[in-house]
Structures are given as C-alpha cells and as structure tokens.
C-alpha cells in the first residue's frame, strides 16, 4: 500500500474529529480524506465478506469528492491525500481512466504545494517526500498501463526519496471504531 497517509497524524486527526460535536462538523479538508479512506475500506469489506452489498463505497467516494470541491480554497496536503486515495480506490474498481485523471490532479496539487522540491531540514520533510513519491509513482504506473502521458518532466522535481520507516501500529489500535453518520 502506498504510504499516502501518515498513520500517527491521521489517527490523531481522526480522534479529534470523533470528539467534535456532530453539528459543528461542516466541510473540512480532513473530512474529504476520511471519506476517501471510507470509500476504499467499504469496497474492501464487501469483497472480504464475499457479499454483494449495495454499499460498495461509491457513496463515500462521492462524499469525498464533494467535500474536496467545497474545500478548494484551503490548499494543503489533505487535498493531495484525498485525490491520491480516490485514485487508488477507482483503480481498485477497475476504473483506470478515472484513476489516471485523479492521480494527475493529485500530482498537480502536490506540485502546487511544492512537494516536488527538496526541503531538507523541514519538520515534515519525510511525510512530504513520501506523499510526493506516492503520487508520482501512482501517476507514472497508471500512465504506463494506459499508454497515456504522465505529465511529469524529470527536470521539474528534485525531491529526494524518503527514508524507509516502519510505522508503529499501536496508535492505530487505540483509535475508536465509529465511522457512523459523520
């Protein structure tokens, strides 16, 4: 799996999200990422159970896109994460054309944030680097599979490859299991 999300950051944001009053939860960049994660998870759950449920994740996919478009004025890594996760989700549904388009948007959003540039010494250098290389690889693989242009010129980026780090599952195990009607 692509390390699009930092497990620790995502879990902390998720726990904060669950602690908020439901009435105070309008559109937010994190919410678009969360719905994208739910879309992927819903699809995996229905496949794992061997059921043909009507909820295969498309509703969450649409909610993620809706929240994403409502938050376009708030540019941040959540925009890149949402688009990249939705791209992998579309690919898992064998909708490679949609996946390629979403991956291309994720690359452009990452470039807009400067993730393609080497920022050594930055506090979140590793997570920025991981996210860039995830969207770069996702876009390149899809472009190659479909015979379409990747849209990334090698001279346009100098982001170094991130270090290999094993993430601790302990924080993920602490997260409450309540997707519910958020």
Feature names for model-found ranges:
Residues 55, 101, 154-155:
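Short sequence/structural elements of tandem HEAT/ARM alpha-solenoid repeats
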